[in-house]
């Protein structure tokens, strides 16, 4: 039985994207494929093992519901990996990954000595990942601290209890989190809490949706049905919450940050994927924007 109920859909798809990108030489995540296998989505594990995602001529490889999403997730992973490397070179030794899912950055990346990575997610997600990695005899590359808590709860207090120091600059990562997963009020609260816990010089990397297309919900329904046919049961209501969201770079700029934004085309181009694959489907476009910001 698939374990998506334990780890979540976005975590599962993120692992699939990293597994594909690793086989293509775009990333180096040796744990993505075994983690995905442990989740147990036959369609994904079979397609990756057969290299079907990487082949343009294959029926699966041409499916925009698969390739466009996995390309975007892989591009974002590379974007965040590079962001963290730059933060380390700048002297930041405290990292917080919000909703870390099945990513394994504390194991797979190089870190400057003295770095602590705090991974926040629901306890069952962290427990699932830890169990699989123990079975793989995975070795940490830096200090790691798992913080099992829902981001709707008081996660800053949970961070402080395990040694997080808000007086020191932090590198924050918010992947697939500011794209409608939280309700508008919840997203604003998360950004307020993050800002309050950020000393001068802290940095943030995140993705968000700059606009909400009126056709977006229709496209998402089609997206969900496509993945259900492949064995991945997605609850659309738990994934996105349509509403009036702040434009994230603008919100950050008015709350003590200096933001910069990049397009999905920029990130895909950096991976050499170019225009041959397009994010979105049908008449609506699911086109995220990628934000970095520095606390002033």
Curated annotation (Swiss-Prot):
EC number of this enzyme: 2.1.1.-
Gene3D superfamilies: Vaccinia Virus protein VP39 (3.40.50.150)
Position of the signal peptide: none
Keywords: Methyltransferase, S-adenosyl-L-methionine, Transferase
Keyword Nucleotide-binding: no
Record GO biological process: methylation
Binding-site positions, S-adenosyl-L-methionine: 121, 150-151
Cross-referenced InterPro entries: Ppm1/Ppm2/Tcmp, SAM-dependent_MTases_sf, SAM_mthyl_Trfase_ML2640-like
GO molecular function list: methyltransferase activity
Record-stated family: Belongs to the UPF0677 family.
Function: Exhibits S-adenosyl-L-methionine-dependent methyltransferase activity.
Identification of the protein by name: Putative S-adenosyl-L-methionine-dependent methyltransferase MAV_4764
Species classification: Bacteria, Bacillati, Actinomycetota, Actinomycetes, Mycobacteriales
């Amino acid at each position: 039985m698939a374990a998506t109920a334990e780890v979540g859909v976005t975590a599962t798809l993120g692992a699939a994207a990293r597994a594909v990108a690793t086989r293509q030489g775009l990333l180096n995540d040796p744990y993505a494929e075994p983690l995905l296998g442990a989740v147990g989505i036959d369609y994904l594990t079979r397609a990756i093992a057969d290299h079907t995602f990487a082949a343009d001529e294959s029926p699966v490889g041409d499916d925009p519901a698969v390739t466009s999403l996995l390309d975007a997730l892989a591009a974002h992973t590379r974007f965040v990996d590079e962001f963290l490397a730059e933060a380390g070179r700048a002297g930041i030794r405290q990292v917080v990954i919000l909703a870390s899912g099945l990513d394994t950055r504390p194991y797979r990346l190089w870190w400057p000595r003295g770095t602590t990575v705090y991974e926040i997610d629901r306890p069952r997600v962290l427990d699932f990942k830890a169990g699989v990695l123990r079975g793989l005899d995975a070795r940490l590359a830096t200090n790691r601290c798992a913080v099992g808590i829902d981001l709707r709860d008081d996660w800053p207090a949970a961070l402080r209890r395990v040694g997080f120091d808000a007086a020191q600059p932090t590198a924050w990562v918010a992947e697939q989190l500011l794209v409608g997963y939280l309700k508008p009020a919840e997203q604003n609260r998360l950004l307020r809490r993050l800002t309050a816990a950020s000393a001068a010089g802290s940095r943030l990397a995140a993705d968000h949706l700059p606009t909400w297309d009126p056709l977006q919900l229709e496209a998402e329904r089609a997206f969900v049905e496509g993945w259900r046919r492949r064995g991945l049961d997605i609850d659309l209501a738990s994934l996105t919450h349509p509403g009036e969201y702040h434009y994230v770079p603008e919100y950050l700029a008015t709350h003590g940050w200096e933001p910069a934004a990049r397009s999905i085309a920029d990130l895909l181009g950096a991976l050499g994927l170019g225009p041959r694959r397009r994010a979105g489907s049908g008449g609506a476009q699911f086109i995220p924007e990628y934000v970095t910001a520095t606390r002033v």
